[in-house]
Regions:
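Conserved short submotifs of the Hanks-type protein kinase catalytic core
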Residues: 82-96, 100
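Protein kinase catalytic-loop region centered on the HRD/HxD motif
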Residues: 121-131
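AlphaC helix of the eukaryotic protein kinase fold
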Residues: 44-66
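Activation-segment/catalytic-loop signature of the eukaryotic protein kinase fold
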Residues: 78
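Activation segment signature within eukaryotic-like protein kinase domains
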Residues: 115-116
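Conserved catalytic-loop aspartate of Hanks-type protein kinases
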Residues: 191
Length: 290
């Protein structure tokens, strides 16, 4: 465990402890170069000999280094400290969406749509870099005090440019696309499904499938119809159901083509317009409209 005032690579000084997960510890630190507070994520000492955990941490380090987007956590530096790999990234003043949900139960539709617009932008950028996040959920999304959304945790992200890497059933089963529950290769539509489940939770304060164990939840993703958001929040109309059901279609071919198409329907919800992708596509086919 790091201590207050420990120096990391003569660039960072530990100023506090922020928490820990299953794989890493997270500390607050000052950056001698930028003069700004940063977060230091360092793999736990006991996991340094665990190849799978090291690969996961290094995968996150590599992929984060190529990302530069206002809605993705920015990594400033990476390296090793006493044989333990670490990441130094921007310090977030705020909470995860999961913490927000636990504190306020759910977001208004307007608030949720503003969050979703940012998430669609960030995921579109990630996908254009040939990366599938694979772990989109409120716990991996920061809600800054200025309203900015930041996606974090690329530990199990799938690099489409490295197809030899074995696809595994990893991630949170509550947000897992049906095809991933079956061990299939991740795609853009897999992230879109997880984003749709996240949207469902933002506007209802509930998860669509809460079963007795992980296997039953996976079966629900595969076979059970998505419950209507109206059941949990009577103020929401059928258009919200339409958007979430399209994002979370059991067959990935029936989901949004990409996050920009998803974003257009989120914007239509925000503008209270009855002009959604499926309807636009019908007009295109019948009248040749754009």
């Amino acid at each position: 465990m790091l201590k207050i005032d420990d120096r990391i690579d003569n660039r960072h000084r530990i100023t506090g402890r922020l928490g820990q997960g299953g794989m890493a510890e997270v500390y607050e630190a000052s950056d001698f170069i930028s003069k700004k507070p940063v977060a230091i994520k360092i793999i736990k000492e006991q996991l340094c000999q665990d190849k799978n955990q090291l690969d996961r941490f290094n995968n996150e380090s590599k992929l984060c280094a190529i990302m530069s987007h206002p809605n993705i956590i920015k990594v400033y530096s990476r390296g090793e400290y006493e044989g333990r790999p670490y990441l130094a990234y921007e310090y977030m003043k705020g909470q995860t969406l999961n913490e927000c949900l636990r504190n306020s139960l759910m977001f208004s539709l307007k608030e949720a749509c503003y969050i979703m617009l940012q998430l669609c932008d960030a995921l579109y950028y990630i996908h254009n870099h040939n990366v599938i996040h694979r772990d989109i959920k409120p716990d991996n999304i920061f809600y800054n005090t200025n309203g900015t959304i930041k996606i974090a945790d690329f530990g199990i992200a799938y690099d489409l440019q490295n197809p030899s890497k074995k696809s595994e059933v990893v991630g949170s089963v509550y947000y897992m696309a049906p095809e991933l529950c079956k061990g299939e290769t991740p795609t853009i539509q897999s992230d879109i499904y997880s984003l749709g489940i996240t949207f469902f939770e933002l506007v209802t304060g509930q998860l669509p499938f809460v079963e007795k164990d992980a296997n039953e939840i996976a079966k629900a993703h595969l076979k059970k119809p998505l419950p209507s958001v109206h059941t949990f929040n009577p103020e929401l109309n059928k258009n919200v159901d339409y958007v979430i059901e399209k994002a979370c279609a059991k067959n990935k071919e029936n989901r949004y083509v990409d996050c920009m198409e998803f974003k257009k329907d989120i914007q239509a919800l925000l503008d209270n317009k009855d002009n959604f992708v499926q309807k636009r596509n019908i007009f295109k086919r019948v009248f040749g409209l754009k």
